[in-house]
Amino acid sequence: TPKVVVREGDHVNAGDALFANKACPDVKFASPVSGIVTAIERGERRKVLCVKVKADAVQTSTDFGKKNVETMDGAAVKQALLEAGLFGYINQLPYAVSTTPDTTPKAIFVSALRDMPLAGDFEVELAGNEEAFQAGLTALSKIAKTYLGVGVDQQSAALSNAKNVELNVFDGPCPAGNVGVQVNNIDPVNKGEVVWTVDPSAVIFFGRLFLTGKVNLHKVIAVAGSEIKTPGYADVLVGTPLSAIVGEQLKQTEHVRLIEGNPLTGKKTTQEAYLGGHTSEITAIPEGDDNEEMLGWIMPRTNDFS
């Protein structure tokens, strides 16, 4: 449950906390931009829906100081991620929930293979971020043994030559890239045990923090689906309005289902929503609610199920 730690009218820098885990206040979530907090929107039972920040024309970031991950220990890595509001990007199994700093994982898993429907290739995002990705992997390896899962067709040297991790190559159909499937095949979670899972985009976020001392939540996502004019990739910032990403790309605005994620496991959303920190693709497909055939599926037919 999030607890908002800012008020409307406050000025925040990129990297300053917007909200924290109510059950574990040390786990904070960083603002992706510097600017003025314009609104804190709540839903039923005062559930926090979003914190809106109007970005400054000139961005400023809180400086947490550059760090040499090679000389850090696990406790120092945890503390750095907590201070910068990035620790919340780590999930734990079982239950796939955000973890806490007092949890001791037996292993950490990162899957760089994205094989869900219409998913983008992580190597596109990795290009130009190789140093940050390796720094993030090294930092995680200080906490626990770290496994990196890659696809048999992925060619990036930053993946195949990754250091301080155990590399596992997966070949097969979806869900071979699912991190839970990889955990089950490599180091299953037994009773009383916990493993951490980290999205590869978050690994880059971690690496940037240690290399530059600043929070940088830029990422590359896939914009796909049959209702997108030109499917491709978009370099965006976490928290960007979806209207700015797909607004001009949609073939039509009615009878379209916009999905944050992939068609199988993503969630239905709207253009008024914002890009989530764990989102790697935005999908637009037909809603299927514009069929006005009399009696619908009851009618006998030869080219469709009835």
Task: Label the predicted regions.
Residues 26-34:
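Short coil-to-beta-strand transition motifs
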Residues 20-26:
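Short boundary/loop segments of OB/S1/cold-shock single-stranded nucleic-acid-binding domains
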Residues 27, 41-306:
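Buried, small/hydrophobic-residue-enriched core segments of structured protein domains
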Residues 1-3:
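Acidic, low-complexity mobile loops and tails
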Residues 34-37, 47:
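Short beta-strand/helix segments in adaptor/scaffold domains that form protein-protein interfaces
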Residues 6-20, 39:
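Short, well-structured beta-strand-loop connectors
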